């Protein structure tokens, strides 16, 4: 009975959290004789994908389980199911070691059988023979790389970084066997496939390895992340199999990462997430031979050449094949790699797939100031599309000096930006002239938990509307409420409280001046009163912060998720009154269980609140020879945004946003209810109550299920909050050798008073105004 109850509870969790998971489980248990090796599906929906090889004219890869998947050029199927490995894999009863199938490496034996090097965290690597005719998987050898592969507490952590099989030997690089080694320093071992012996060859910053000839290997060398060198090197190196000595063959770009290494004949083929690259004998030059839908690169992801195509897998773009005989595109756009993530990155990949005539390469820049960008835009490393965060000083300076192309020529692009929240676009859309496309917005604000407010006897009238009222509430809580209400914390994660509050007060004052159209000033009475209050609380805030830190380190601090509108949190039955890491978002506005609301704060009483926002914008380098193609890409990004992304940036989109998983989830719930109802009909009377409870819970969940991910009501609430977001334009605290920033440090270090700070800051602002005039 107890076991049945737990089982039904597990089924219910699967039903609510993993649509489709239980249906598959039920389907497979209905008929144990079902040949699951013939199931066809897109296995690259899975997050983890390992080594990839060609055998018998087909492509094989390792996925979670382990599972061997086969691709025949059109469809994927599971060629070797996880159950085939159950008798040969090692399993730790006490959890002292674990396996890592996505670091396993496939090779092909002379008879077409797959060979697999399968690693474990305790330094053991099994050589498995994996037939493709549903015969048993067998263990050929079990290699132990080191007898001493544990740290002081006995836990094991060996991690396989690279491996290759060639002739009678396998070579592997592993990290973690030397507890004193710096990050990236791997040990290279030779495994004798005939007698099962192990020989350490060398220790170096080499990860991926490939066979070169009878005496040498090719390795990917990367010492950039050691922190021990002023001369970072990323290169292909030749490794002597006997001595381990290396010599550099071909240096590669130090700002890039690489993955998908494979041999094609005598050439090394790999990618940087954007380009397919080849290094041919004598291995001294990197050449581009194709372009991928660009994505972020993880070094250990697989690659394989099959026929005329290069196959690679990436977590963001899935499986991609590139015809290596196709001509290279005439236009290649270099764009800022900072947008390779998220929705913008997805749209860039989508554009690349739809426009093979345009190659897209992600590249980075260390520029942060206008002079830095100016120099970069005129160099050989210049980008066609740059990304900027606002607020900041570089974008406005480059815009005003004519370094950014005007984009108003694209009517679709202009229309998309014109309909966005005007408080977000003031710096990119100036007097009808468009200079950039906003692609991302983020905010930071305080929130207050109304449930905690009620618990401690406070009312809506006690909710702060100014920063001075917020400081008074914090002061009162620390003074009076801490002892009276120990079950509630004042706030979540109070790190650097004085500096955090000071920065928010300064930004709010700037935002209010800009919103009012006033000359920037720091002499307003309300501002000075707020700053004086903060100054008087600094020691008290530090003491509270120190006490909170001690409690947190001792495990005494946990929070309820209902108390947070964003940011991080722990979970328990109680929540804090305040969160300093809240944000404005449709997702949080739509959370029906949240008892937290954002605080709309101002400096002046009865003034519109100012929530400080940040936006990422994309702008075209005016000097680019591909400016038109870059503008076409920006137009594509603007027009093809999802409904959710449009709603985030524009008040014009308020329609309900459909949940793409609604029908699947609904069918799954109905299927679970049907299966449980059938099972209940033949269950013992003692079990029926558990079935009824599980069915009722699923029925309730089905009733609550909505076809909409976000409703018009959610979006309108978000829109009303976004009206208070400000992207400040003042650059008083930005730029190198900034005098105002130096002044802030002197004040926060306690070297000057509030009056001295205000007086000096006023002088700096007046000088800036005179210079700009």
Please describe what each predicted stretch is.
Residues 590-670, 678-681:
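Extracytoplasmic/periplasmic substrate-recognition and gating elements
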Residues 675-770:
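C-terminal capping/gating helix-and-loop segments adjacent to ligand/active sites or protein-protein/ligand interfaces
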């Amino acid at each position: 009975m107890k076991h049945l109850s737990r089982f039904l509870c597990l089924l219910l969790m699967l039903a609510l959290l993993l649509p489709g998971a239980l249906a598959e489980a039920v389907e497979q248990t209905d008929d144990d004789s079902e040949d699951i090796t013939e199931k066809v599906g897109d296995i690259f929906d899975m997050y983890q994908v390992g080594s990839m090889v060609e055998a018998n004219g087909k492509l094989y890869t390792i996925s979670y389980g382990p599972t061997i998947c086969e691709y025949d050029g059109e469809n994927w199927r599971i060629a070797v199911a996880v159950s085939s490995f159950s008798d040969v894999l090692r399993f730790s009863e006490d959890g002292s070691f674990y396996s890592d199938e996505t670091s396993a490496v496939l090779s092909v034996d002379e008879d077409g059988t797959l060979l697999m090097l399968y690693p474990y965290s305790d330094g053991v690597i099994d050589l498995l023979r994996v037939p493709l005719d549903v015969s048993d998987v067998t263990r050929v050898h079990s290699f132990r790389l080191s007898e001493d592969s544990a740290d002081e507490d006995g836990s094991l952590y060996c991690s396989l970084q690279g491996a290759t099989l060639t002739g009678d030997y396998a070579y592997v690089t592993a990290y973690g066997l030397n507890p004193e080694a710096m990050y990236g320093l791997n040990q290279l071992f030779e495994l004798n496939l005939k007698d099962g012996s192990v020989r350490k060859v060398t220790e170096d910053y080499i990860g991926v390895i490939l066979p070169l000839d009878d005496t040498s290997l090719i390795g990917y060398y990367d010492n950039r992340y050691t922190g021990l060198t002023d001369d970072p090197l990323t290169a292909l190196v030749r490794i002597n199999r006997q001595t381990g000595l290396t010599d550099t063959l071909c240096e590669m770009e130090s700002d890039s990462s690489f993955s998908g290494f494979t041999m094609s004949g005598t050439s090394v083929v790999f990618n940087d997430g954007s380009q397919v690259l080849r290094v041919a004998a004598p291995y001294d030059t990197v050449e581009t031979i194709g372009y991928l839908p660009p994505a972020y690169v993880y070094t250990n992801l697989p690659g394989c050449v099959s026929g005329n195509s290069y196959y690679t897998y990436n977590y963001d773009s899935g499986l991609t094949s590139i015809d290596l005989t196709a001509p290279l595109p005439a236009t290649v756009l270099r764009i800022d790699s900072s947008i390779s993530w998220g929705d913008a990155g997805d749209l860039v990949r989508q554009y690349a797939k739809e426009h093979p005539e345009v190659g897209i390469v992600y590249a980075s820049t260390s520029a942060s100031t206008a002079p830095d960008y100016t120099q970069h835009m005129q160099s050989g490393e210049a980008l066609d599309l740059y990304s900027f965060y606002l607020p900041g000083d570089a974008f406005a300076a480059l815009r005003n000096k004519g370094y950014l192309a005007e984009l108003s020529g694209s009517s679709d692009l202009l229309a998309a930006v014109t309909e966005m929240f005007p408080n977000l676009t003031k710096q990119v859309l100036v007097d009808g002239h468009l200079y950039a496309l906003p692609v991302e917005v983020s905010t930071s604000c305080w929130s207050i938990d109304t449930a905690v407010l009620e618990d401690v006897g406070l009312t809506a009238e006690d909710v702060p509307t100014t920063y001075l009222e917020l400081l008074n509430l914090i002061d009162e809580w620390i003074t009076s409420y801490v002892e009276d209400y120990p079950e509630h914390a004042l706030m979540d994660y109070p790190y650097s409280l004085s500096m955090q509050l000071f920065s928010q007060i300064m930004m709010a004052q700037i935002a209010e001046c800009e919103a009012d159209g006033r000359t920037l000033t720091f002499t307003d009475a309300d501002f000075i009163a707020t700053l004086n209050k903060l100054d008087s609380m600094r020691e008290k805030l530090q003491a509270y912060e120190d006490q909170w830190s001690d409690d947190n380190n001792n495990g005494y601090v946990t929070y309820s998720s209902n108390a947070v509108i964003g940011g991080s949190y722990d979970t328990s039955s109680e929540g804090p009154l305040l969160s300093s890491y809240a944000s404005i978002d449709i997702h949080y506005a739509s959370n029906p269980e949240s008892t937290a609301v954002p605080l709309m704060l101002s400096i002046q009483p009865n003034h519109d609140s100012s929530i400080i926002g940040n936006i990422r914008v994309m702008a075209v380098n005016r000097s680019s020879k591909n400016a038109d193609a870059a503008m076409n890409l920006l137009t594509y990004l603007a027009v093809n945004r999802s409904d959710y992304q449009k709603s985030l940036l524009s008040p014009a989109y308020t329609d309900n946003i459909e949940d793409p998983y609604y029908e699947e989830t609904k069918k799954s719930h109905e299927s679970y209810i049907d299966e449980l109802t059938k099972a209940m009909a033949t269950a013992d009377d003692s079990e029926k109550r558990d079935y009824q409870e599980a069915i009722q819970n699923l029925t309730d969940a089905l009733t609550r299920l909505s076809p909409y991910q976000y409703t018009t009501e959610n979006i309108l609430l978000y829109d009303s909050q976004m009206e208070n977001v400000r992207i400040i334009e003042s650059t008083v605290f930005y730029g190198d050798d900034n005098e105002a920033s130096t002044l802030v440090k002197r004040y926060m270090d306690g070297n000057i008073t509030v009056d001295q700070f205000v007086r000096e800051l006023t002088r700096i602002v007046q000088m800036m105004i005179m210079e700009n005039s």
